[in-house]
Amino acid sequence: MKVYLDAVSTTSLDPEVGKTYKKLLDEYYCNSDALYDDGVAIYAMQEKSRSIIADTFGVKKDEIIFTSGASEANSLAIKGLCFRHPERKHLITSIYEHSSVYNSFRQLEEEFGYDVTYLDPDKDGHISAEMVKDALRSETLLVSIMQVNNEIGAVNDVESIAEVVKKHPGTYFHTDITQGVGKVDVDLKNIDMASFSAHKIHGLKGSGVLIKKGFVNLSPIISGGQQEYGIRGGTSNALTNIVLAKTLRIAMENKDKYHDYLVQLHDQLIDGLKDTAKINYDKGLMTLVNISTPVQSEVMLNALNDKGIMVSSKSTCGSRKNELNRTLNALGIDENYALRISFDYTNSKEEIDYFLKTLKEILNKYA
C-alpha cells in the first residue's frame, strides 16, 4: 500500500486539469505571440485565463503576472522591487520564510548591501502586525511575510500586517500565499504583491503567478521581450498558463466541498498520534501536523518509506542539503526528530489508519 502524506510539498495532478492540458498539447504548439490564427487563438485563451485568475482574487487583469512558480514569483517581487528602488535599503522579513524568499533577502544583504531585519515567530508560531510595526523604519522599502508557513502550518494575519504597512509611506508589502490558496481565504485589498504555485493545488509544476498591484513598479529579473507587461521576458508557457485558471477554480470549489471531510481526517490523525508521538504544532492549517518521535527523523523516513508511506522531515527545497531548519529552530523544536505530515482530500481514512498503525510498529521496533 502506498500512502502519500506530503501534500504541502506537492500534489497529484487533478484529472480534469491533466485532460485539458493534454488536449491543448495535441492541438496547439504555436507561439502565443505570433500573429497568425493559431497564435492569436492561444494568446486569447491565455488572456481569458488571466482574467479568470484576476477575478478570483479581486484584482485587475494586468495585475496577474505568469511565472514558472512561486519561487520565481517571490524572486521577481523582492529583487525586482529592490532593483527598481535602490535608494531605500532596509527590508523586513521573517526567519521562517520559504527558501525562495529567505535566500533572496540573504542575497540582497550579502551582495548588494541591504539591511535586512529578520523577525522571529512568537511562541505560537506567528509573525504579528505589531512585530512588523516595531521593525519599520523611515527607509524601509519592503516587508515580506508568508501567509501560511510550510513547515508547521502557522497562519499569519497578513491582512493586518498589510494594514500596518499601508500606513507607512514608501513601503510595500508582499506575501507568499502558496500554502494558503484553496485552504485559507485572503483579502488582497491592502496587499501589494502575492505569489503562489499551481502544483500545490493539484496543478502543473512549473506554473505560478505573481499578483502585482498596478502602482508597484518592478525591474525584470528575466530580461527579454515584452511578455508579461515587460517584466518577465521569454516565450510564454501559454498552455500551462491557460490551465491554471481551471486549476484555481477547482481548488476554490474543493475548499468548501471537502472541508468537513478534511476535519475528519485531521481529527483521526491527531487522535491516533496522541499516544505515539509528540505533536509539535497543530494550531494552524488543519491539513499539516508537525510531530516528534524518540527515533531520529532519517531513520523514521526510511522505515516509513519501506512500508510505502511518504512523509517529510523538512521543507523539500532544503531536504537534500544539510541546511538548518529555520522554522523548527526558531520554535525550539529539534529538527533531528521531527516529521511533517500533510494530507488533502485525495487521502482516505484507511490511509491514515495504515500510517498510524505503521508508525506505532516502527516506534516499537526502534524506540
For the regions a language model picked out, list residue spans one by one.
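Pyridoxal 5′-phosphate
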Residues: M1-A367
